UniProtKB/Swiss-Prot annotation:
This is tRNA threonylcarbamoyladenosine biosynthesis protein TsaE. Mg(2+) binds at T43, E104. It comes from Aquifex aeolicus (strain VF5). GO terms for cellular component: cytoplasm. ATP binds at E12, G39, A40, G41, K42, T43, T44. The keyword Magnesium applies. It is found in: Cytoplasm.
């Protein structure tokens, strides 16, 4: 994986701008892996990505911690949001190619086209490293 960019986010607006940048890179079948501790902003980023991809109701985007998988229609096909926190060995391979996958807590590099590592710097500040195949 190649480091594409490293940014500091200080607001939800910064998160949305980053999500817009990433949305422009997407063709519609990528796997985006989101890494970071609890509360780092993984779900917040997916909400911003949903908005950037023109999901009809981005405020309805919720963490799939208990459902494991949530799907949303976008201008580029489906956004499939998967959370591996409770079930790290969940096999989501059937979803690959069905849309853009945003996978929280994926620690393996193999399935990832893009990796976002989110580090908490303080209550409102995050460092994000973006890697790409």
């Amino acid at each position: 994986m190649e480091l594409l960019k490293e940014v500091i986010l200080e607001s939800e607006e910064d998160t949305y701008k980053l999500a817009e940048e990433i949305a422009q890179l997407l063709k519609g079948s990528e796997v985006i892996c989101l890494r970071g501790t609890l509360g780092a902003g993984k779900t917040t980023f997916v909400k911003a990505l949903a908005k950037a991809l023109k999901v009809k109701n981005p405020s309805a985007v919720r963490s799939p911690t208990f459902t494991l998988v949530n799907e949303y229609e976008t201008d580029k096909g489906k956004l499939i949001h998967i959370d591996l926190y409770r079930v790290p060995d969940f096999d989501y391979s059937e979803f690959i190619g069905e849309g853009i996958l945003a996978v929280e807590w994926e620690e393996r590099d193999k399935p990832c086209d893009i990796i976002l590592e989110i580090e908490i710097l303080d209550e409102n500040k995050r460092k994000v490293r973006i890697y790409r195949k």
